[in-house]
Amino acid sequence: MALQESTPSLQNLLDSIPNLVDHLYDNRKGSVLKDAVLRQPTQFVAPEFTNWREEQMACRTSIAFYDQSFHMTTTFIRGKDAVALMNHLTVNSYTTFGVDRSRHSVVCSPDGYVIGDGILYCLAPDELCLVGRQAGHNWVRFNAKSGGFDVEIEEDEFMADNPNGRRNFYRFQVEGPHAPALMEQLTGAPMPQVPKLHLMHVTIAGRSVTAMQHTMAGNPGWELFGPWDAGPAVKEAVLAAGEAYDMKRVGSVAYFTTAMELGWVSRPMPAIFTHPEMKAFREWLPETAPEATWALGGSYNAPKVEDYYFTPWELGYGNVIKLDKGEFVGRDALAASQGNDHRQKVSLVWNPEDVAKIIEGYMGHDQLPTRYLEFPRSNYATWLYDGVHDGNGNHIGVSIYPTFLWTERSMCTIGVLDSAHAAMGSEVTLVWGEPSSRKSKYLEPHRQIEIRATVAPAPIGKR
């Protein structure tokens, strides 16, 4: 993603526009399905193998099979300073990190706001593998190349953007109440009980497979990965064995709803646009990078991009912040704000009568319609932030990732709310639809509507 000499940088873009929020609102938005099939191309993952409702349910009733080989960005970091680089950039501690361990790594800006997160694997001495969304990868790659660390990186882009037409690793996930029995059948023995985020090695279809106990939706599950060329044989064996357990392959439509099920904010606004110490990064990053071309949307209409940033505490990552590990990017800001009254991440369950009013609102021609509600996922912008207020109209937080969960028979969102309004069972109101002051050529003209919602746990399956 490094800047080519003839390409303007993100900093050039920021210097040329009057307001970044307005610019991001004007970026292309609208098609949820288009985004899903871009990240999981249809020649590899069907939008639906059966139907998205049964595919959502499988993780709770039988087994869900997720093919994760195509949509995530991967960065390999090799060299004697590999761990030192990540220790410098992330909030995590690495004192017990080593081969066959992994971390949920979180990278923050110097002022303590989240840039991105991902899973960091230690594959061998001095060899790490970071897997996740693109924003955090660009920051890691920039620092690997410019920070004076003795490392080399290999960029393995998601499939639709990958010049090699293949990935280094296949990556599958099996999850559901029958997943332990399936894994025992595939490997010939019960899966060993190992601590969270520890890797183990098993044999499936005669191939060595790296496995990690991991959940996408709060149920028993394992991530399985290995060399790309071994993927078809392993996949065939898993699918064949899964037939006895009514395992369902999960298509791209249902797959991306798992973030709501898990309560994971998969695409926070990356906190890269404003801090002066990150100017060199913005000069390195091209204006064509996703951070500049993805779209902002929703009813939350704040004037500054900083208003869309999250702290790691707000996203539920407080347990991985290790302030006592020494210096790292963002440490001073996080230490200074540690005792603050942080907003809290929750689930918001929409009132079904109000959901019906949204749909009723675009039936007929007698008035300006409500904003179209797409099922099962309606985040029509990359960063979709809807405003949330209390019964007196006071702003109390944001609502993101609108998703219909067949597992809950409910329309839900992830909320990040002021702590005074985050108690389970609290009633709040969110606003669905863009403000009339913002006209997008990618969205139909529509009116806003208020939606009552009830605060529930995140992950929502805990309610």
Annotate the PLM regions.
Residues H71-R78, S109, I119-Y121, L128-R133, ...:
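Short secondary-structure transition/capping motifs
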Residues E54-T61, V107-D117, V202-M212, I396-V398:
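Short amphipathic beta-strand starts and helix->beta connectors
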Residues M1-H104, I115, K345:
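Acidic, proline/glycine-enriched N-terminal capping motif
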Residues T96-G98, V107-Y113, G118-A124, P163-N164:
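Short, charge-rich binding segments
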Residues M1-D35, R39, C122-R463:
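Conserved, structured C-terminal
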